[in-house]
Amino acid sequence: MALLGTGCATAYRDSAADEALAEAAPTEAALSHQFTSNRLSKAQLDAFQIRAQQKLRDFIDYLTIIANPALDSAFRHIAAQQAEQLFTSPQAVVRAWSGSPGEPELVSISSFLEALIQQEGVLTFSIEQLAVDQPLVLNDSAQYEGELSFNVSGTADRATHRTGVVVKKVTKKFGQETDSVWEVFLKDIQ
């Protein structure tokens, strides 16, 4: 959320995750090992669980920006791009909710965000009752998966939503070097 900071709440959430990661890796060597190791420790998994919750909150904050036609269109499109990057892939689906009642449908994240950009009127979203339903556990693909549940205020859809969370290795470039590091992503929102 460097480009689209949402104030003290996001800064506090980032600080909590940074502190949890710092406790898990007090030295530079340990920090490097934390992100490149083949398995994660309990403390590291706890830190990534906190980061997953932050990413979900960030997604909801992005939705409020995207759904505000009073904001600059380019700014809203950048917010949509950043929101999409929180997911495992652009093909992730979202149970589309809006400010109006009706049966929500499953749509791709990109279609959902584009519909919000086209929406008439301002919508404001916030998370209520965020819970960890399934803590992060190692799967057969050498990734960690878990599940969060939450309710969203600002919508007519009062159902409990669920999203999968995955912590997987991704290739990142650090100057001239590349390395595989752990990163957390959201999956489909149902």
Which sequence ranges carry the predicted segments?
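Juxtamembrane and targeting peptides
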Residues: 9-70, 74-82, 87
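Short beta-strand edge/turn micro-motifs at domain boundaries
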Residues: 141-190
